[in-house]
Amino acid sequence: MKNYHDIVLALAGVCQSAKLVHQLATESRADSETFLTALNSLFITQPQRIEDVFGGEVRHLKLGLETLIHQLNAQGDQNLTRYWLSLLALEGKLSKNPDAKQTLGNRISRLKEQEIHYARDSEIMLSIMANIYSDIISPLGKKIHILGSPDYLRQELVQNKIRAVLLAGIRSAVLWKQMGGTKWQILFFRRKLLATAKQIYSSIY
């Protein structure tokens, strides 16, 4: 039997990354706590439970749950829809590419070693995360076209933040697949996903 609670949490993680990308592209900034939650998820590779990936508490996925609920209600921004569905598609490509998976694992291991020297949200670490996305994930499929302010999107720091958040989105997409998530559920069990997302969201308050 599918654990829709965990499937929804992982999918909320994907949607949260999509929302952060939108914020960065249109405003050049994102909610700091939510941004850190995304980055931190890259360092949690052996969680005891799914909440551990997102700071141990469901409240850290509040923005992602809000976004997911809007998306499942067909009230969401079309760009956000494209972002999170593209992340799921890229995860599908990654799962079928053993070499890319191994390289990604090795690069994430080296990333974790760097936090001895640098803060996770430092410009150096963001650059490393962005390079991992560009080197391994981006070549797997169609590149995600990000829409926003050209002035912001030209800034290297904003570019690196966006790619780092996209990498975190891939982390959540991998988790979603591991929890039993499928695209068929999004098509045929939308009401079940929506009801579960609303139930989890209501528990935050």
UniProtKB/Swiss-Prot annotation:
Q: Which cysteines are joined by disulfide bonds?
A: none
Question: According to its record, how does it sit in the membrane?
Answer: Peripheral membrane protein
The entry's keywords: Cell inner membrane, Cell membrane, Cytoplasm, Membrane
What GO cellular component is one of the record's annotations?
Answer: cytoplasm
Give the domain of life.
Bacteria
Instruction: Extract the InterPro entries matched here.
Output: HflD, HflD-like_sf
The listed locations are: Cytoplasm; Cell inner membrane
Q: Which family does it belong to?
A: Belongs to the HflD family.
Q: Which NCBIfam families match?
A: PRK00218.1-2, PRK00218.1-4
Q: Which HAMAP family match?
A: HflD_protein
What is this protein's record name? High frequency lysogenization protein HflD homolog
Q: Report the source organism.
A: Haemophilus influenzae (strain PittGG)
What are the leading ranks of the lineage? Bacteria, Pseudomonadati, Pseudomonadota, Gammaproteobacteria, Pasteurellales
Its gene? hflD
